[in-house]
Design a protein with these regions (language model features):
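Structured, hydrophobic secondary-structure cores that serve as assembly/anchoring elements
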Residues: 1-289
Length: 289
């Protein structure tokens, strides 16, 4: 369910096209260039394609897609012979996403201290103009710039090491699909529903079949509610969406609407100082901001 071509940002559009061909049932992990410098200007220019590149390359990125995400920066690790090598962001994130899925589900964000830790690289950084790897911690100021262009930062956090601190997809417009956990949930659902629907091919196109397939879909979605993927859902498979004309064309329609669970990305904890006795007396007003 993951697609990547580590080290080749120019292959991103090809991967997106392939995912489109297979019905957007996977998630594309894209790379930023090795030589992309950790400055606000450089990152903003690349993410916004200020140079007006016509293809994805070192000067800019042109591809937008809900099922695509970019990460920054690259990493430093050792190969099988013990040599120190530079690896692209996807090298780190493929491992991180797989590890996240192993302890949770695809609809849990592969980011943050619980599931976003990078364990297959020793530092993060970029390759300078002399071909030398330079480490960078990707501080909050750069993380804010990266968020503005929907690129997910791999930061060095004190006491925690390398951690992915973002889960933006490369969606062109703001929607639930501009977050990776929701995108991967939808891709997962598409795969499961494709499998679920196949046994109903060539069954009688009648009320019983409609009832059976609706029950099967309800069961899958109800399980996802229990697994913290969905807040709610609705499934319609009756004569309202299976009209006589559709039945005469040998079609069976199942319409589904879902409310995906969103991830916490910002935490606000304001601290108020009160006079002695204010809490005991109840004279502290509302604590809600």
């Amino acid at each position: 369910n993951l697609i990547a071509c580590p080290g080749y940002p120019e292959a991103v559009q090809n991967m997106v096209d392939f995912n489109t061909e297979i019905g957007n049932t996977a998630f594309v992990v894209g790379d930023t260039p090795f030589r992309l410098e950790p400055t606000g200007t450089a990152l903003s220019n690349w993410g916004n394609n200020t140079a007006m590149a016509t293809d994805n390359n070192e000067t800019g990125v042109v591809t937008y897609d809900d099922y695509l995400a970019f990460y920054y920066p690259s990493g430093l690790t050792n190969d099988n012979k013990g040599n120190t090598i530079v690896v692209p962001p996807s090298h780190m994130m493929l491992n991180t996403i797989v590890n996240s899925d192993a302890v949770s589900y695809e609809w849990f964000a592969p980011a943050g201290l619980n599931r976003g830790g990078i364990i297959n690289a020793t530092s993060a950084g970029y390759v300078d103009m002399n071909g030398v790897f330079q480490s960078t911690a990707v501080p909050q100021s750069l993380r804010d710039v990266l968020a503005g262009v929907k690129i997910n930062p791999i930061s060095t956090l004190q006491g925690s090491g390398l951690v992915c601190m973002g889960q933006y997809s490369r969606a062109k417009v703001a929607s639930a699909l501009d977050r990776i956990n929701v995108v991967r949930l939808v891709a997962y659902l598409r795969r499961q529903l494709n499998i679920l629907a196949k046994p109903y091919l060539f069954e009688p196109n009648d009320a019983q079949t409609r009832k059976e397939i609706k029950g099967a879909v309800d069961s899958v979605l109800l399980e996802l509610v229990g697994q913290r993927a969905l807040n709610d859902f609705i499934v319609v498979c009756d004569t309202t969406n299976n009209t006589p004309a559709r039945i005469d064309r040998s079609e069976l329609h199942v319409d589904i609407a879902i409310e995906p669970v969103k991830a916490v990305e910002f935490i606000y904890i304001p601290l108020r100082i009160l006079n002695t006795g204010a809490i005991a007396s109840g004279n502290y007003g509302s604590l809600a901001a």
